[in-house]
Amino acid sequence: MKRPLFYSSVLPFFRSSAHLFTLLLTPPSRFPRELKGYTTQRKSDLTGAVSVVSPSDLAKQNENNPIKAMQGRVPGMNISADGSPSGNATVRIRGVGTLNNNDPLYIIDGVPTKAGMHELNGNDIESIQVLKDAASASIYGSRAANGVIIITTKKGKDGKVRIDFDASIAVQTYAHKMEVLNAKEFGQVMWQGYVNDGLDPNSNGLGYKYDWTYNAQGQPVLNNISMSKYLDAAGTTPAADTDWFAETTRNGLIQQYNVSLSNGSERGTSFFSLGYYKNKGIINSSDFERYSARMNTEYKLLKINDKNLVTVGEHFTLNRTSEVVAPGGFLQNVLQFNPSLPVYTTDGQYAGPVGGYPDRENPVARLDRNSDNRYSYWRTFGDVFLNINPLKDFNIKTTFGIDYAQKQQRIFTYPVTEGTVANATNGVEAKQEHWTKWMWNAIATYAFEKGSHRADAMVGIELNREDDVWFSGKKYDYAVLTTDYMWPNAGVGEAEAYGSGEGYTLVSYFGKLNYNFADRYLLSLTMRYDGSSRFGKNNRYGIFPSVSFGWRINEEKFLKDVSWLDNLKLRASWGQTGNQEISNIARYTLYESNYGEANFGGQSYGTSYDIAGTNGGQTLPSGFKRNQLGNDDLKWETTTQTNIGLDFGILRNSIYGSLEWYFKKTKDILVYMPGIGVMGEGSSQWINAGEVENKGIELNVGYRGNIGDFQYDLSGNIGTYRNKVTKLPETIAANGTFGGNGVESVVGHPMYSQVGYVYDGIFKSQEEIDNHATQNGAGLGRIRWKDLNGDGIINEADQQWIYDPTPDFTWGLNIYLQYKSFDFTMFWQGVQGVDVISDLKKETDLWSGLNISNLNKGRRLLDAWSPTNNGSNIPAISTMDNNNEKRVSTYFVENGSFAKLRTIQFGYNFPKNICEKLYAERLRMYISAQNLLTISSKNFTGVDPENANYGYPIPLNITFGLNVSF
């Protein structure tokens, strides 16, 4: 792979930098604080849209990735993930606001990152807050347009030494499984396809032999199916009936162990933890393993007159993860591989396709060859800080943070000899990548209180740097095919080497002012000024302001005597945030080397000149070609958001909740504009050209209380949003990249919405065919397309918008019950009114799905239309696709709504007398199940609407756990 050359990333007075590292301030102790972010603030004083998630709720999910466990717990935050052992997840807060990276910014103990949260030990988390509106997030400026998630890890508390130990083990199994044809059913369906097409089924070339005839009504009747004993002439590949899902999957196992030690005194606190997590996935050989260690300390070094003058501390974690990832497209490979083929030949080798069977790798062999492709990943992440409190209510804090990661992997290529699939190549690629991110900041805060007036102010500066360096070496032809031997130096064949590096700088100045009058009227002002080396010299700096107001209505005199009203606060905010998530070299004119004369399709793409004029004679062995035009006017994407919210609590806050409305518009979206031919080679360029709108409503409500020893807490949330692309360059809006399938412009429609044909049933009689519009490929049992424009011809003009990826709403419901020492938790999560495009349906409903014959299919084909099964809506089986039934159409757009029982847990806390006998302070045992039940639309034909196609299956987990404290 070639990388661009000649770039630099330099601000006028700093080298280029990475992530903006934030910090957590310690406020004056006389102001009790509840929520923590860039600064801290009383929850009652908040004027922005902030959601808080309890780590104890997340722990019940038994997820490796704490962010994945937040599914359904925050209105307006959509999380999608498959069931892979590493637990990677995609997070979207309040819709999709850009054509580029839509991931939120994570702040861990004040240090920002966009790297994977599956590397973080969720057991170390103390609190999680989600900042959703611009007033809350604008203090993070240029990287906060997609929302901010703040994670604070645990620290020691005053008192005696405390030791906590947590252990759990979980068994995983398939919650939903693809139903595919077995060998006999495959033969039956193939026979029907041949007969429907007027072909001789005994000419199939797969070893199937049919005894069949026509009945008195002229309908074909299958009497018997048989197969040759061996599928190949050599007699080494016996006919089989292989369940390839059973051969390539297993019951998975998750083990998790955590131990922590914490202590604290008036001079300081400390927290240490060790963790281990291992997930053996339900696909054979796939697994994820993590070792983690954390140290958080804080010490007061200088104390004068009971006043802490100097405090130092740190938060550091060291993690080592490793993973074997299931091969790409593996489940599709399993579905398609023919059940008539065995796993092994008679001589113990992996079997493969023979005769007329299509070329596909044996799935079991493919997993075996992939099992050595493990990566290892080391990451150290954290900060050290110095806090000085020289005057009353005046505080200065400086922090240095680092995020360093290193990834290593060898990718092995082993020879393949499986029937007609053969490749003698062997080799190995050794890869390394290093990410280095650092930040330094200095922040001063001042708090003021007099009478009914209370205010605090903050100003700060921050510097960030990020570098990414990678290199890779390949070597071929090894004498010994073992992992111990296959290092690049041992190969004797061709060698290849690649490598590159890049980075960027971010410098920031920011400030914030909060004002509170009489605990009734609240005002907050924020300003951030960012400069990034990713942008052109004419627009390198950006300003991100916000303002928010709050009115605590329940504190007004006219409501003071309303005893049942505990909290009623109206909030309103406006602000701007930015997005700079593009390539570090987007603003540069790029060239790459292209030596010699490269020919493709009869055209020369090299940069050398044929001096001799002999069309391939002497050439100048040098040259560079342009890949990209620079743009000195490139600038930030800017998201402007308005938010109105209402917080309420009644009956001693037993009923509580919040309601939010928001509107946000992103403009100057960064778009990679393809060049036109008349501008010459390499005329593509990054520009600011797009606009997207998102608007929505969020509701969170809860009810809690107790009846004697019985306690309960019921809470639910619902969120809805609408997305629309409002501006794009015409050539991009209509090319299908962001929606429209290249047929219609996506402007005015939700991002990634699609255009296609409308399914109008199955032709079930010749009369229906004759009365329908002219349609190429029309026939009995074939799909009928709707003539939308009424011109009597089915063509491209008969397409409309058929797919919208935006759900009507998402929701979550949490039920917590406790009676004495017993507790019960049940959590439901769901999505309503969302479209999914089922690529899987092309394999379950169409025999000619990929225009490759003899691939296995789904069992739905057993109910395909035929003259004797006239009521079916599944197209008739055919070896051909004359009707182009694979085209994008409503036949493959299905209702992806679902409700999932994410977690159900029963727990028991042992009584104090038993704990004392075990020298324990607390002892709890529990059993739980995850993904126990899924309720989906009756019209959904796939496996799992949450994971509608070929993603790693989401398993059902049964977990046994233990929590003990000393």
Regions found by a protein language model. Give the residues of each.
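Short, small/polar-rich motifs associated with maturation and membrane association
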Residues: 1-295, 300-303, 308-316, 326, ...
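Surface-exposed loop/interface segments of Gram-negative outer-membrane beta-barrel transport/assembly proteins
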Residues: 44, 158-241, 282-292, 296-379, ...
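A generic beta-sheet turn/junction motif
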Residues: 97-99, 263-267, 276, 301-305, ...
